[in-house]
Design a protein with these regions (language model features):
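Aromatic-lined substrate-binding rim segments of carbohydrate-active enzymes
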Residues: 83-148, 221, 225
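Aromatic- and acidic-residue-enriched segments that line the glycan-binding/catalytic groove
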Residues: 112-118, 142-166, 217, 221, ...
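Short beta-strand-plus-loop segments that form exposed binding edges in beta-rich domains
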Residues: 488-493, 615-621, 688-695
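N-terminal carbohydrate-binding accessory modules
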Residues: 45-97
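Active-site neighborhood of glycoside hydrolase catalytic domains
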Residues: 174-245
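Aromatic, loop-rich ligand-recognition surfaces of beta-strand-rich domains
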Residues: 647-655, 664-720, 725-806
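Aromatic-lined ligand-binding clefts that engage carbohydrates, nucleic acids, or primary amines
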Residues: 441-457, 560-583, 590-591, 613-616
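Catalytic-core region of carbohydrate-active enzymes that cleave or remodel glycosidic bonds
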Residues: 260-354, 358
Length: 806
């Protein structure tokens, strides 16, 4: 016999005759011990605890200065199969952190039913970032904005008619607490001190743009802590103009701003209040988002790179929003208000990494910069290869299921109700009634209100299309006999994701009236049909074979075959308005008006062989066919509405008008408030800019408020621009309505070759008692447009604009 002493007190005894077995055992044992050693060391490397904290003028990681260079990505806007590719792209760009929102409404689509699996697995996303050596900043809301449906809040909150969102409303806060606990279960174990990679967690989101309510923000902070986020710094973000409104003493304060901003000016007030705090721009906007019916947005690469250089040279941390925007798949796009404007499905954002994950000029310019700010001894990894791209030959649709021939179960209601009251979150809703009496020609059908795009039918004949974006809530009727079937089909285009308008119920929100002269009659007794956008609802319709393209709302079905898969862009340019599903995946919205004409189709959702595609077109296509392109089309507008707010031949006449107030603005950034000596009543508010601060012709305004009798800003919900003497639309969307779009980084700007004076007339929608106004100049550094001298005119009736050319 032979005794082999393998480990201190562990003996294996083998009979010599079995030496071959022994040798085999030793070989396997060696392999096992080697793999165990490697695995143990790998696991230890992945779970090593660290400490992240705020130090004097810098963040500290394990006691050493650390500059956060974060890339904002959204797991919801990237197919799960591509998560790691996009994270690797960010690392190759020079980032050390990934910043993410948590989208409440995608995890709790039905009250009480949470989903953190698959595409929604936020813990897996964070672990993927850690796998590639990236830290994570978590922004759990509950409100996130992000150009996302209702700012991330679940639609079913609106079933409670008196709910006050983003306040201490008891039901709202109860649901926020439940949601935060679920997020904590997923992510609190991944805090950096526990061996994970989460280094910071945000409390609420840009609340200063919503209101002043420190008790509410404090309550959200407490819920975040109670959910388990107690071991990493908590922070709150806002704009430099309003961050003090709700600033809590025990949170880190950060500010958000865009490319071209004056860095020193943005942090000036924060440094005065907290001279030793680490500075961070928690959203440095690399580009901007697109709206249906408006030009594709871009921002100069050089301005973005220069802004980041300015921050790094000052030891300021940043998160680049967006580093990769991706795609708002399905129905999840949000909207702005006022004026209502829905977001496109593409969230390309003109970011350094394109919608499809490609490198851009911005990517390489920024990568070249960030190479200079690496820790000693580090180099950037190679840029990952782009994913395969394919073309798909044109294929046609011959199977059609008319929507009116595929009605779901009917529901009855005496009075009009929005879709939430029928337990519907998204999609379209059909309201049907019969006219109780003959309707005379010229009678007005008034809908209060259309949310968001409606088609009106009488006995199946299309009478009108009404668009909330344009304030279209009425139509003139022809003669209609008693008993005529009146159908109003309303599509929900995306709930508002910013400001108080997030209480955005869909369908018809209040009532429908017939108005003739001074008489009005509210229509009652409605039959309602709900059309959600779930694949389970739309997949099994009664399709007919036809080569005739209908002009009525319909579902279309086809298949296409592939020899190989890859990313592509579905060309929807011959279609009207609706949504697309491929192999059960909701791809997004299309609308002929543009600017987006293609839908990004990830190759990971395609398959070799036969693929199924379904299209819902509420308007009807010109040609029912689709092909896959190798490049997107994001900048083709077909909107026929005028871009600017001055009709041909108009020229504002002010010579005989009474000046309500005159003065001069002080130079520099930041809000300026002006109070009038006396109260003035009026509906039409005119600002005339008389001279610039610098030697240029340009006038520019970022935001504008009119102060009411209580000294507070009046509602801008229904404001319209009646007149602007000049608006720059060649280099960007610089139209006058930007002064009340609630975004400080967008602005009205006049054309550079049009001299002063410049005039702007706002229709306040009703007579207001005006006590003054607030004005925010354009925020960018060393850019023109600062106004010096001005005059104010206020009238109850509209101004004289001369003869309009028809």
């Amino acid at each position: 016999m032979i005794e082999l002493n393998i480990t201190g007190n562990f003996k294996i005894v083998y009979v010599f005759v079995y030496c071959n077995i022994y040798l085999a055992f030793m070989k396997n044992l060696f392999v096992f011990l080697f793999l165990f050693y490697v695995s143990s060391n790998y696991s230890e490397a992945q779970t090593t605890a660290h400490k992240f904290e705020a130090g004097k003028n810098t963040f500290l990681l394990d006691g050493k200065p650390f500059v956060v260079k974060a890339a904002e990505l959204h797991y919801t806007r990237i197919p799960q199969a591509y998560w790691e590719h996009r994270i690797e792209m960010c690392k190759a760009l020079g980032m050390n952190t990934i910043c993410i929102y948590i989208f409440w409404n995608i995890h709790e689509q039905e009250e009480g039913k949470f989903d953190f699996s698959g595409q929604n697995d936020i813990a897996a996303f964070c672990r993927a970032a850690q796998k590639h050596g990236m830290y994570v900043i978590v922004r759990p809301g509950p409100y996130v904005c992000a150009e996302w449906e209702m700012g991330g809040l679940p639609w079913w909150l609106l079933k409670k008619k008196d709910i006050a969102l983003r306040t201490l409303d008891p039901y709202y806060m109860e649901r926020v607490g439940i949601f935060m606990k679920e997020v904590g279960k997923q992510l609190a174990p991944l805090q950096v001190n526990k061996g994970g990679n989460i280094i910071m967690v945000q409390v609420e989101n840009e609340y200063g743009s919503y209101g002043i309510d420190k008790p509410y923000v404090s309550a959200v902070r407490d819920l975040v802590r109670e959910s388990g986020f107690t071991d990493v710094p908590l922070f709150q973000c806002d704009w430099s103009s309003n961050f003090t409104n709700n600033a809590l003493d025990d949170l880190i304060w950060t500010v958000n701003f865009g490319t071209g901003a004056n860095i020193d000016q943005q942090f000036k007030k924060l440094k005065e209040l907290r001279p030793e705090t680490p500075l961070m721009c928690s959203e440095f906007w690399s580009g901007w988002f697109d709206h249906w019916g408006r030009k594709h947005e871009t921002r100069p690469a050089k301005d973005m790179v220069q802004g980041i250089k300015d921050m790094l040279d000052r030891n300021i941390s940043f998160s680049l929003y967006m580093t990769h925007g991706g795609t708002t798949f399905g129905h999840w796009g949000g909207a702005n208000n006022p004026a209502y404007s829905a977001m496109c499905s593409s969230y390309d954002y003109d970011a350094p990494i394109s919608e499809a994950g490609w490198t851009t000029e911005k990517f390489f310019l920024l990568r070249d910069l960030l190479k200079n700010y690496l820790p000693a001894g580090e180099t950037l990894p190679e840029v990952p290869a782009a994913l395969p791209v394919i073309e798909i030959p044109e294929f046609h649709f011959t199977k059609v299921a008319p929507l009116f021939s595929n009605l779901p179960e009917a529901k009855q209601t005496v009075d009009i109700q929005p879709m939430e009251q029928f337990n519907q979150g998204w999609g379209a809703i059909l309201y049907r009634t019969t006219l109780p009496e003959v309707t005379a020609a010229g009678t007005t059908l008034k809908i209060t209100e259309v949310h968001d795009w409606a088609q009106v039918y009488a006995d199946g004949k299309l009478l009108a299309r009404l668009d909330r974006r344009k304030g279209e809530f009425t139509t003139t009727l022809p003669v209609l006999k008693k008993g005529t079937q009146l159908d109003i089909l309303v599509e929900a285009m995306g709930r508002v994701n910013f400001d108080k308008s997030i209480h955005d119920r869909k369908g018809i929100t209040e009532k429908v009236e017939l108005i003739s002269g001074n008489q009005s009659k509210e229509l009652k007794n409605w039959t309602v049909y709900n059309f959600p956008v779930d694949y389970s609802f739309i997949k099994d319709k009664k399709y007919n074979d036809t080569k005739i393209v209908p002009t009525m709302p319909a579902y279309y079905k086809s298949t296409f075959n592939l020899d190989k898969v890859g990313d592509t862009f579905l060309d929807m340019s011959t279609w009207g308005k609706g949504m697309v599903w491929v192999n059960g995946h909701a791809m997004g919205r299309f609308w002929e008006i543009g600017p987006q004409q293609t839908l990004f189709m990830p190759g990971c959702w395609l398959k070799e062989g036969e693929n199924e595609i379904l299209v819902l077109d509420l308007k009807g296509p010109v040609k029912a066919s689709i092909k896959g392109l190798k490049k997107p089309i994001l900048d083709v507008l077909r909107e026929k509405a005028p871009e600017t707010h001055r009709k041909d031949g108009e020229k504002l006449k002010l010579t005989s008008e009474k000046v309500g107030h005159e003065g001069a603005f002080t130079p520099g950034n930041g809000w300026q408030e002006v109070r009038f000596a006396t109260l003035v009543k009026g509906r039409y508010f005119c600002l005339e800019a008389l001279s610039p601060q610098a030697n240029d012709n340009i006038a520019a305004i970022a935001e504008f408020d009119v102060l009411g009798v209580d000294g507070k800003p009046v509602s801008r919900e229904h404001w319209k621009i009646r007149y602007a003497d000049s608006e720059e639309t060649r280099s960007g969307n610089r139209t006058a309505d930007k002064i009340f779009d609630l975004q400080e980084s967008t602005f009205w700007m006049t054309v550079d070759n049009v001299p002063y004076p410049h005039q702007l007339v706002i229709d306040l929608s009703k007579v207001e008692t005006v006590t003054g106004f607030r004005y925010l100049p354009r925020a960018e550094k060393e850019y023109p447009g600062m106004i010096r001298e001005y005059r104010i005119f206020i009238k109850k009736e509209d101004f004289d604009y001369g003869k309009v050319v028809l």
